[in-house]
């Protein structure tokens, strides 16, 4: 044969069945080894598809052999990394003359009963042992040793000698584990072979250098050949029967997979030799020539250079040799998939690296490989720890007498598997064997009773006084830990109780009872702060909040207590909280109409009330705290084992402990998988509902009158009377020049004709209007004179000024009745306005009832009470107070308003106000301030701001306003502002134009045009409305309203009211007849038939 090296992959059809000499040792692997094989297969099968070298036209097939002494057949597993390591090996060389190389590579397969398995884990890749063969004159001998070491796994480093007789070339290749410091080429290949052929005869080609570096954990073997046809190299011989190799090739135990640390028992060595005279060697004629004599990596290496590779070379008898003449079995399939089942979960393809002249470019930094290696190690370690958590939880449930089919147990195991999938690399699926193996291991450990259970749980008990906290603790430990008394407080200080329940260490923190009343929250804060100081060094794992099942309440009576707990400990206290309902053996109350209610329905309703209250207190409506029932009474029904049983057949103590242990197990899994940031409340715990910024902004943009002194209450706000004083003087003189007028009686009016009656009524209306204008004008003049006189008497003696103030501000000494309230229309025969009459007394407080206009009770329709008063501070600063409280059977609403104004300078005044009102189930507190500038007669400007506290969110707003007064009939108000909260901003503006009657307010004509714009979250809302009131005669009005927005929604309404034209009521018959006609339409008749 000529010089050079050639890799040949033996085809299944060309292999000859050779007689097998030697003996085959049997090794039965442990359960852990089996599981690891399945795991490696699942992770490796994805990369088998589409990764075949271009130069190799055939595939390596694998055979199944019958077991020698065991009927159980283990599925053959072979990873794609092995195939790359065996099939894709190429040696590039410069072909000179007739130089040929022959290397026989074997595809090594295994059977569980026929082989020894040692899987090494180095650089996050599982490299198996490679059996090295010495090929000489067609004979091959392979040997394989099984290494057993609990601390270090040794790598079988074999040397492969290829004797080429015809040429003078001697090449060797060594199998080993490549260290992370090697180049990408060494990592990509399992077996690295490089050869350089030198022809010293006729071709006259210069000598070339050949290097091979293999790092085997402890040392590196370097061989250099400079112009030599033969070389000296280091090789490690594997001695049959040895249990350890040279120290220079030992692999640290830390790189060994945890499942493989259970060493298999060595029973012998496997030797297979070829007895036939030679092997059929088929040379590969598609070898690519490379001038630089470098290693050429196949396309599959190029495509999967960055993929995670886990190769496992399985030791077995050679597929070309057999002790018997039995026919070869077809390729084995994975367990559970069947013969025709396709391979699942292909590995994701990565972007191909750029190539230069057909070779892979190795310019990627080595840090990427190191990071991938670290992630794989961390992933495998995390899976083992998570499996240990599964085993621990199954042991806990087993001790509590719960099967894996229990709802709580199944749910916890499902969450653990789901978390592992989310955390696992590339979203790898968790095999079903994880649960089976964990369950079997848990049962085995519990049956052996030798391995102690490393688990303890700390439970802190909170609850109202008298719900049974101390009694529950005694029931958990089945002994009297704390003395209880039905008439005295059991626990007066925080104390720690420890004990064992079914061999599990349980620590319970007992706390003093809390009080639900709002007035007792200060005392509760002291108790809870002492509890917080007690648990600072050793925080509890679970919080058990106890309440009574038989104390049902649908109101928010416990909300002050729950909010106090949240304020002291923070909202996170409820994330690992369990709700316990004591007195669970109580009979459910009667249902509606005296019928018996279901026990399960009663428990569900009571649980929902407490869970909803906890959600509101924590500020997270996604919380769903588990509920457990508790019964501590000695007369409670028990089962044969002496455990207390509830009316629904549940044994409450194991269920409560299982919930507590499950919560801690899930917390441990969260900490292991680093999912702490994903728990509820970590990001949204303190975030409550966002404030309604558009509503707050619209309230801010509303124009409010400023508080005034008592003598200024009836003054016109804008002093528009000064705008047209000439017209007022003319109307006043006109009234004085009117001739005398005699009023007619009803009898005299009946004698008048229709035209005469109309003229008489018109004259009467004209005279009344002029008289009312004169009265209003005189009242304004009197107010101005009093204001001027008050300014002049400031320098006078105190006694005189006090008399003037009393005359000015003292109310009437005789109470006078206030006008009757206008009650809504009803079908009652009586109009009980007399029930709502009250007197205007000399008291400064004005207290009035609040009438529910839409209520069903017209006799006594009181809904609340309203109180108002005007204070004067230092005779200059008015302070107005108004409050209203309304109460019905379910809710109570409070509305409070406090306002004041101060004048500073000419034409400038500042108002300050405080509002408190209900907003849903919370109270909204608003502080607002506004400054007005009245320097111009027809133009007035204002600027204001407000701050609103709603729940735990604070909103701040700013507005500007401008009022333009053209004359007495036309005015326009423009305002704009913005409201912000939590980084969210809403913008808005309003425009209102008003056109009044010439004789307003005596004239009834009024038209108003409004336009509003609101921008919130990029959503622009534009709305317009118009309202007009037109008088029709003396006693009729026409009111029309219309509104439209930018979304096409609008409304139009027309209303006519009259006190004389009763025939207008006939219009109400139109919709009635229209409805009746629809009942007798042909469509309805046909449908009826």
Swiss-Prot record:
Residues 165-176, 353-374 have a biased composition (Polar residues). Its main location: plastid. GO terms for cellular component: chloroplast outer membrane; plastid. Mg(2+) binds at residue 470. Its cofactor is Mg(2+). Residues 631-633 are annotated as: G5. Residues 485-488, 548-553 are annotated as: Homodimerization. Keywords: Acetylation, Chloroplast, Coiled coil, Cytoplasm, GTP-binding, Hydrolase, Magnesium, Membrane, Metal-binding, Nucleotide-binding, Phosphoprotein, Plastid, Plastid outer membrane, Protein transport, Receptor, Transmembrane, Transmembrane helix, Transport. Residues 454-683 form the AIG1-type G domain. Gene3D superfamilies: P-loop containing nucleotide triphosphate hydrolases. It is a single-pass membrane protein. The modification Phosphoserine is found at residues 179, 263, 283. Residues 300-312 have a biased composition (Basic and acidic residues). It comes from the Eukaryota. Residues 489-493 are annotated as: G2. GO terms for biological process: protein targeting to chloroplast; protein transport. Binds 1 Mg(2+) ion by subunit. Residues 510-513 are annotated as: G3. Residues 767-788 form a coiled coil. Phosphorylated by KOC1. Homodimer. Part of the TOC core complex that includes 1 protein for the specific recognition of transit peptides surrounded by a ring composed of four proteins forming translocation channels, and four to five GTP-binding proteins providing energy. This core complex can interact with components of the TIC complex to form a larger import complex. Chloroplastic protein precursor such as prSS (precursor of the RuBisCO small subunit) interacts with these complexes. Belongs to the TRAFAC class TrmE-Era-EngA-EngB-Septin-like GTPase superfamily. AIG1/Toc34/Toc159-like paraseptin GTPase family. TOC159 subfamily. This is Translocase of chloroplast 120, chloroplastic. It comes from Arabidopsis thaliana.
């Amino acid at each position: 044969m000529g010089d050079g090296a050639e890799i040949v992959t033996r085809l299944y059809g060309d292999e000859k069945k050779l007689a097998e000499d030697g003996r085959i040792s049997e090794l039965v692997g442990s359960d852990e080894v089996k599981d690891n094989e399945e795991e490696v297969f699942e992770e490796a099968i994805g990369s088998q598809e589409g990764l075949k070298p271009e130069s190799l036209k055939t595939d390596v097939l694998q055979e199944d052999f019958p077991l020698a002494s065991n009927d159980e057949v283990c599925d053959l597993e072979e990873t794609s990394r092995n195939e790359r390591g065996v099939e894709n090996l190429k040696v590039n060389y410069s072909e000179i003359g007739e130089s040929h190389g022959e290397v026989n590579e074997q595809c090594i397969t295994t059977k569980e009963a026929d082989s020894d398995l040692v899987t090494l884990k180095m650089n996050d890749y599982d490299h198996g042992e490679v059996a090295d063969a010495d090929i000489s004159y067609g004979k091959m001998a392979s040997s394989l040793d099984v290494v057993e070491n609990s601390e270090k796994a040794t790598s079988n480093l074999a040397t492969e000698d290829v004797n080429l007789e015809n040429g003078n070339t001697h090449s060797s290749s060594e199998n080993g584990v490549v260290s992370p410091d090697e180049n990408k080429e060494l990592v990509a290949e399992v077996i690295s072979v490089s050869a350089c052929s030198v022809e010293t005869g006729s071709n006259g080609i210069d000598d070339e250098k050949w290097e091979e570096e293999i790092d085997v954990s402890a040392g590196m073997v370097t061989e250099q050949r400079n112009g030599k046809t033969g070389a000296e190299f280091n090789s490690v011989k594997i001695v049959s029967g040895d249990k350890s190799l040279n120290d220079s090739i030992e692999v640290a135990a830390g790189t060994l997979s945890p499942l493989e640390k259970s060493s298999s028992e060595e029973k012998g060595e496997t030797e297979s030799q070829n007895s036939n005279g030679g092997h059929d060697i088929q040379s590969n004629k598609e070898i690519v020539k490379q001038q630089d004599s470098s290693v050429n990596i196949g396309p599959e290496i190029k495509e999967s250079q960055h993929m995670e590779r886990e190769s496992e070379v399985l030791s077995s008898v050679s597929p070309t040799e057999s002790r018997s003449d039995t026919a070869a079995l077809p390729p084995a399939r994975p367990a559970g998939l069947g013969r025709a089942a396709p391979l699942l979960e292909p590995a994701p393809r990565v972007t191909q690296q750029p190539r230069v002249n057909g070779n892979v470019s190795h310019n990627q930094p080595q840090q990427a490989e190191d990071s991938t290696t670290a992630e794989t190690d961390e992933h495998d370690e995390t899976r083992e720890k998570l499996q240990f958590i599964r085993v621990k939880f199954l042991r806990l449930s087993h001790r509590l007498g719960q099967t894996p089919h229990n709802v709580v147990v199944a749910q916890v195991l499902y969450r653990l598997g789901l978390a592992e999938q989310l955390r696992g690399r590339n979203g790898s699926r968790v095999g079903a064997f994880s649960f089976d193996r964990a369950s079997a291991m848990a049962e085995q450990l519990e049956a052996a009773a030798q391995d102690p259970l490393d688990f303890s749980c700390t439970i802190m008990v909170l609850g109202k006084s008298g719900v049974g906290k101390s009694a529950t603790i005694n029931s958990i430990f089945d002994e009297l830990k704390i003395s209880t008394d039905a008439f005295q407080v059991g626990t007066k200080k925080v104390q720690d109780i420890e004990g064992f329940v079914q061999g599990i260490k349980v620590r319970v923190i007992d706390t003093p009872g809390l009080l639900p009343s709002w007035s007792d929250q200060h005392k509760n804060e002291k108790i809870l702060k002492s509890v917080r100081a007690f648990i600072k060094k050793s925080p509890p794992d679970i919080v058990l909040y106890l309440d009574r099942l038989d104390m049902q309440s649908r109101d928010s009576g416990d909300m002050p207590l729950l909010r106090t707990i949240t304020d002291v400990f923070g909202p996170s206290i409820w994330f690992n909280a369990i709700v316990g309902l004591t007195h669970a053996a109580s009979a459910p109350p009667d249902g509606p109409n005296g019928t018996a209610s279901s026990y399960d329905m009663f428990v569900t309703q009571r649980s929902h009330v407490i869970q909803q209250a906890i959600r509101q207190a924590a500020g997270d409506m996604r919380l769903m705290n588990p509920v457990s029932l508790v019964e501590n009474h000695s007369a409670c029904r028990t089962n044969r084992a002496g455990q207390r049983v509830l009316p629904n057949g549940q044994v409450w103590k194991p269920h409560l402990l299982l919930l507590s242990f499950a919560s801690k197990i899930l917390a441990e899994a969260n900490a292991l998988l680093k999912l702490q940031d994903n728990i509820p409340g970590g990001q949204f715990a303190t975030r409550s509902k966002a404030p309604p910024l558009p509503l707050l902004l619209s309230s801010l943009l509303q124009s409010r009158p400023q508080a005034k002194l008592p003598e200024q209450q009836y003054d016109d706000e804008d002093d528009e009377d000064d705008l047209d004083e000439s017209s007022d003087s003319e109307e006043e003189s006109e009234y004085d020049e009117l001739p005398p007028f005699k009023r007619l009686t009803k009898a005299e009016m009946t004698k008048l004709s229709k035209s005469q009656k109309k003229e008489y009524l018109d004259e009467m209306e004209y005279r009344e209007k002029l008289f009312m204008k004169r009265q209003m004008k005189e009242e304004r003049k009197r107010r101005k004179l009093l204001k001027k006189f008050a300014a002049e008497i400031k320098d006078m003696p105190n006694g005189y000024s006090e008399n003037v103030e009393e005359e000015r501000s003292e109310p009437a000494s005789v109470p006078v009745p206030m006008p009757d309230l206008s009650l809504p229309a009803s079908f009652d025969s009586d109009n009980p306005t007399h029930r709502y009459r009250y007197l205007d007394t000399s008291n400064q407080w004005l207290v009035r009832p609040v009438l529910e206009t839409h209520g069903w009770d017209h006799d006594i329709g009181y809904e609340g009470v309203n109180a108002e008063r005007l204070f004067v501070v230092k005779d200059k600063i008015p302070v107005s107070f108004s409050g209203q409280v309304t109460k019905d059977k379910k809710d109570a609403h409070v509305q409070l308003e406090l306002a004041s104004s101060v004048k500073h300078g000419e034409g400038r005044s500042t108002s300050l106000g405080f509002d408190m009102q209900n907003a849903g189930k919370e109270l909204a507190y608003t502080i607002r301030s506004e400054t007005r500038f009245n320097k111009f007669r027809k133009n007035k400007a204002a600027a204001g701001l407000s701050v609103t506290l709603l729940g735990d969110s604070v909103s701040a707003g700013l507005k500007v306003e401008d009022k333009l007064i053209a004359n007495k009939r036309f005015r326009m108000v423009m305002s704009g502002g913005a409201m912000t909260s939590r980084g969210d901003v809403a913008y808005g503006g309003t425009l209102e134009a008003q056109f009044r009657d010439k004789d307003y307010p005596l004239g009834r004509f009024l038209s108003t045009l409004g336009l509003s714009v609101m921008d919130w979250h990029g959503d622009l809302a534009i709305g317009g409305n118009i309202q007009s009131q037109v008088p029709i005669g003396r006693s009729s009005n026409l009111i029309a309203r219309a509104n439209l927005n930018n979304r096409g929604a609008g409304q139009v309404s027309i209303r006519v009211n009259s006190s004389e034209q009763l025939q207008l009521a006939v219009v109400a018959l139109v919709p009635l007849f229209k409805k009746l006609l629809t009942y007798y339409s042909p469509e309805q008749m046909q449908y009826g038939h």
